[in-house]
């Protein structure tokens, strides 16, 4: 994928939602076309609406707790004798993970759309936990679809979702894991889209969900850019930004403000589990 200069990362796709080559798009059944179009139209209005941006920023600061810290790891830097190592402490955010940015924005969108319910899927449970937190904050009823096997593996997060008032729906079809939870969640949304908003927990699925998630987590990158300039008085001549990669939501947010920089100055490095999908291999350097 060749990036276009001066264009935000969430707008790097073509008119059909493709992000270069075979990645992206909107592979959806006909029944989802209208809900997806409506959500796309609403989001494109809200992302430029000054009142909505002010509301988002208010909750990012006073509910999520932004900005999160940018901390030098002095002992590790000394141990390695050379590199100056820093950490962006996104774990300081309310709930302990970056998923809260996306969940909060989705609930704000749901309120603007006049929806009373939010529905989402989860695997490890963090996206579901954050959505249940945000739904409770904004007075929305919440339903989370989760594979039956994942429910057994992730009891603490399941308990947290229930404490926040969410209904956790076990999915027994297929592998009883995330992929099946996503399918069941989509089916439910198709039948209830008149009063229900769907939140996809990462940069996956139809293009609009990738955009909303990336737009939400980009807060991390905006903060980081300011903090780096404050620490070094400018963007250093040589810097490596290392982030974990799973669904892509944190990496998307962590890197989005730095895509216009020359790779010789800022190297973006993703660290992914060994059981990676082969689709990622041509696009991003991994260690």
Task: For each feature predicted by the language model, list its residue ranges.
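Long amphipathic alpha-helical segments
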Residues: 2-46
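Positively charged, low-complexity intrinsically disordered leader regions
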Residues: 17-18, 22, 42-109, 113
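A short, small-residue-rich loop immediately preceding and capping a beta-strand
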Residues: 94, 102, 110-134, 138-147, ...
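Active-site-proximal loop->helix
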Residues: 126-183, 279
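Glycine-rich beta-alpha junction loops
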Residues: 175, 203-206, 245-249, 272-276
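Active-site/ligand-binding-proximal alpha/beta "capping" segment
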Residues: 189, 193-245
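Conserved small/polar residues in nucleotide/adenosyl-binding loops
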Residues: 277-283
């Amino acid at each position: 994928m060749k990036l276009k200069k001066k264009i935000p990362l969430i707008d790097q796709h073509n008119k059909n939602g493709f992000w270069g080559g075979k990645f992206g798009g909107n592979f959806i059944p006909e029944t989802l076309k209208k809900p997806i179009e409506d959500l796309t139209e609403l989001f494109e209005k809200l992302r430029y609406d000054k009142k909505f941006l002010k509301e988002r920023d208010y909750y990012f600061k006073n509910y999520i707790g932004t900005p999160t810290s940018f901390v030098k790891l002095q002992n590790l830097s000394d141990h390695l004798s050379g590199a100056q190592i820093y950490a962006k402490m996104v774990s300081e955010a309310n709930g302990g993970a970056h998923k809260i940015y996306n969940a909060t924005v989705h609930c704000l969108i749901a309120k603007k759309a006049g929806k009373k319910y939010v529905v989402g899927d989860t695997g490890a449970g963090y996206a579901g936990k954050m959505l249940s937190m945000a739904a409770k904050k904004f007075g929305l009823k919440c339903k989370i679809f989760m594979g039956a096997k994942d429910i057994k593996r992730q009891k603490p997060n399941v308990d947290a979702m229930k404490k926040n008032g969410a209904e956790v729906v076990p999915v027994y079809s297929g592998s009883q894991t995330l992929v099946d939870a996503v399918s069941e969640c989509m089916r439910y949304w198709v039948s209830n889209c008149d009063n229900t908003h769907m939140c996809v927990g990462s940069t996956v699925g139809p293009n609009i969900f990738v955009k909303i998630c990336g737009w939400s987590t980009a807060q991390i990158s905006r903060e980081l850019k300011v903090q780096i300039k404050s620490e070094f008085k400018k963007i250093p001549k040589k810097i490596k930004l290392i982030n974990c990669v799973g669904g892509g939501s944190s990496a998307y947010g962590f890197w989005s403000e730095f895509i216009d920089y020359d790779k010789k100055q800022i190297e973006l490095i993703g660290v992914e589990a060994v059981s990676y999908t082969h689709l990622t291999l041509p696009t991003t350097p991994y260690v």
